[in-house]
Amino acid sequence: MNIYNNKKTLFFKLKRNSLKEWQQYTRHKFVISLGEGTLQLSCFKDYLLQDYIFLQKFIKILSLSAYQAKTLEDRNRSVDFIIGIKHELSLHASYCKKFNISKSKLLKTKEKKQNKSYTDYVLSIGVKKSNLELFVALSPCIIGYGEIGHNLSKLKNWKKNKYASWIKMYSSKEYQKIANENIKYLDKLFTKNKKSSYKSLVKIFKKASKLEANFWEMCI
C-alpha cells in the first residue's frame, strides 16, 4: 500500500481536507520541472542555499520539541531527529559541492523572507502549541518530501535526469522509512491528544503547506 494514501491515518485526513494547498505544494512548477529535469540550474542552486538555512533552523525547532516533550519516548524521537538533521546538514554541504556551491557560500547566504516566514510560523506553533500541533506543522516538510520523492521516482527516465540524485535521496528506502515513521507518530500523538481540535490541525496543515509552496516559489 502507498503509505501516503492510507485513509486511516491522520496525515491522509489532513491532506484530504487541505487538497488545494497540498497540490499547490506537491505539484508546484518547481517540483514538476525538477522531475522533468528542465528546472533552471540557478533555481536549484538557490533552493539548495535556502534549504541549508532552513535545516539549521529545523534543529532549533526540534530542540523546542524535545524540551516540550511530555514523555521520554517523545523526547528521544525529537533528539533522534536532531541527530538526523545534523547528519543531513553535512551531506547537504557535500551535495552542494557537486553544483559548485562552496561551504563559505552556504554560510554567507542571507535568508529570504519566504524562508523566514515559514520557519517563524513553525517556531510560533512550537512555542504556543502542543507537540502534536508542532509535528502537524512539520509534516508537510518531513512527510511531503517523501511523497514528492516517491511520486517523482515513478516518472519515466527519471534516472537520466540531472537532478536524479535529489529524487533518489527522497525516494530512498531510508527516507521513505522516515516519512512512514512520522505518519505513524502523528497518529500516536493524535491518539494521546484527543482534546485537540481537528479544525485547528487542518488550519495549521494548510498554512504550512502554503508556506512550503512559497518556498518553491521564491526559487523560481
Regions found by a protein language model. Give the residues of each.
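Helix-loop segments that flank and shape redox-cofactor active sites
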Residues: 29-42, 58-77, 126-127
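Short, contiguous, pocket-lining structural segments
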Residues: 46-57, 84, 174, 178, ...
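Structured surface interface patches that mediate subunit assembly and partner/cofactor docking
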Residues: 137, 157-169, 181-201
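Short alpha-helical hairpin
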Residues: 15-40, 58, 183-192
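Alpha-helical bundle segments that constitute or directly flank the non-heme di-iron/ferroxidase center
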Residues: 19-24, 39-68, 87, 136-146, ...
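Basic/polar N-terminal segments that are highly enriched at the extreme N-terminus
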Residues: 1-12, 16
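Active-site-proximal alpha-helical scaffolds that flank and shape metal-associated catalytic sites
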Residues: 75-177, 206, 210, 220
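Long hydrophobic alpha-helical segments typical of transmembrane helices together
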Residues: 188-220
